Amino acid sequence: SEKPPALFDLTSLQREANRQLGFTAQQTLDYTQALYEKKLVTYPRTDSRYLTDDMAPLVPELVSVIQQSFQIQADVPAPVNAAQVINSKKVTDHHAIIPTKTAAGYDISSLPSGEQAILTLLAVRLICAVGTPCHYAETIVEAECAGQKFRTKGKTVTDMGWRQYAGKPVEDAEKNAEAGDLPELCLLYTS
């Protein structure tokens, strides 16, 4: 199984924004700072990937309003396991970067495209981080022929879990799983 990803701190947000969107670290910081000044995200200059214990009761409602506002698989209510993202001991000055309730009621289309992209990245990560694990079934086949050993393995997704809310990474997981699917096996010859 694959655990849900952690929430973003500034460094992990910058890495992901570079990987997915091609933004530089400075661009990501600038967009996130602008969103913070509009009260759409929490404080961006943080090194924590967790929320504080006192935020636990707020997480389910925040996830629900963010999921609806951003239309993140809105027809499938996201499961919320807030305990995965709550750990006051791992929070120093500021908790992880997350969207605020203000973001849920905001006309996101009025934002510049870079800010929209970062806000959406943060919204999707919040939904994924509190989700259930993604489960796979794996098959390994080993065979020997003419003294040569062959081995192959394939993976099939049995429960998408948090990945069903992740957008493009879901398609990648499905494509990878399909590429690794093994056909039904039958024994044709033994010596």
Residue ranges: model-predicted function:
Residues M55-L62, K89, D93, E115-I118:
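Alpha-helical structural motif
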